[in-house]
A protein has these predicted regions:
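N-terminal auxiliary segments of SAM/dcSAM-dependent transferases
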Residues: 9-37, 50
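SAM/dcSAM-binding transferase cores
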Residues: 233-288
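Class I SAM-dependent transferase core
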Residues: 29-71
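General small-molecule cofactor/ligand-binding pocket signal
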Residues: 49, 124-126, 224
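Mobile active-site "lid"/loop adjacent to the S-adenosyl-L-methionine
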Residues: 154-183
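Conserved SAM/SAH cofactor-binding pocket of Class I
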Residues: 67-164
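Residue-level signal for inorganic ion chemistry
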Residues: 64, 184, 241
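Conserved Class I SAM-dependent methyltransferase catalytic core
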Residues: 53, 177-234
């Protein structure tokens, strides 16, 4: 199902990427009053409604958007879009893209559609299982070799080390199956044009899985580790890959969320406030 909107780690303080405005007072998208909130992202440049419980967008989505290479005219697909945080953040940074928000949960997809409209961003919302096959993608308007950029924040918690959540939506959004990463990257490989870019965020301790999944059809990998602080191991990796590239792997200097006093890094504060992008977004930019 597709719908289109028209254009009309740890922080010591409240994160700049989200200001909780409390529950809304009306009823929308199947949620009763008090069941969802409206939050400010990118220093208030985006206002997003999302469920009060279950999976909620946070700084992973903003960092992913800031690491996504896109330029005006690109067709950009956000796989597993949720309420649209990452894809809409890319659209706020890069004007003139064609944005596709792909989400398996109809309720979240409807929130994403409403969020795009409320923020004046043109976006097509597609209800689709990213793990589905080529026929399902084609029926949804995602033909092979049809997209310039894919970004994704797949479920990445290891089920063997993750305590099951009683909330089905949260479990679906956070816990990976044995084939999640491979199937999502395979879907991106099929959908991207030659030379198209894929950006993803993943657990740092799962980097080996990422490299293995990118082993066929992608090259030019660029990796940016994300640490809570300089004394701690990386907690996330941001990865950009290019379909069909033969370029060698590059590892960028790590991003530290906090300094030694547990104060948010100035660069991170700027990114979360919607001011600027990460190196992965400005190198190896997709498009023709």
């Amino acid at each position: 199902m597709r719908t289109t909107t028209s254009r009309p780690a740890r922080f010591s303080t409240t994160p700049a990427w989200r200001t909780n405005c409390g529950p809304m007072t009306d009823r929308a998208n199947g949620l009763s009053a008090g069941e969802f909130t409206e939050d400010g992202f990118l220093g208030g440049q985006l206002r997003l409604r999302q469920p009060k419980s279950g999976h909620r967008a946070g700084h992973d989505a903003v960092l992913l958007a800031a690491a996504t290479p896109a330029r005006p005219g690109d067709r950009v697909a956000d796989f597993g879009a949720g309420v649209g945080a990452a894809g809409l953040a890319v659209a706020r940074r890069v004007a003139g893209i064609t944005l596709l928000l792909v989400e398996i949960a109809p309720q979240l997809a409807e929130l994403a559609r409403g969020n795009a409209s409320a923020n004046g961003i043109a976006a097509e919302t597609i209800v689709l299982d990213v793990s589905g096959g080529a026929d399902a993608f084609a029926a949804a308007g995602l033909a092979p070799d049809s997209v310039d950029v894919v970004l994704m924040n797949p479920p990445f918690n290891d089920p063997a080390r993750h305590r099951a959540s009683p909330q089905a939506a949260r479990e679906l959004a956070h816990v990976a199956s044995a084939t999640t990463l491979e199937s999502w990257i395979g879907a991106a490989r099929r959908t991207l044009k030659s030379g198209g870019a894929l950006s993803l965020i993943w657990r740092a301790d799962g980097l080996a899985e990422v490299l293995a999944a990118f082993g066929r059809g992608f090259g030019g990998l660029a990796i940016l580790p994300v640490h809570g602080d300089a004394a701690s191991p990386a907690i996330r990796v941001l990865v950009r890959a290019t379909k069909g590239s033969k370029a060698p792997l590059q590892i960028y200097p790590a991003l530290m969320l906090n300094d030694e006093r547990a104060v948010p890094n100035k660069k991170v504060q700027d990114i979360l406030a919607g001011n600027g992008a990460l190196p992965l977004a400005v190198s190896g930019t997709a498009g023709s």
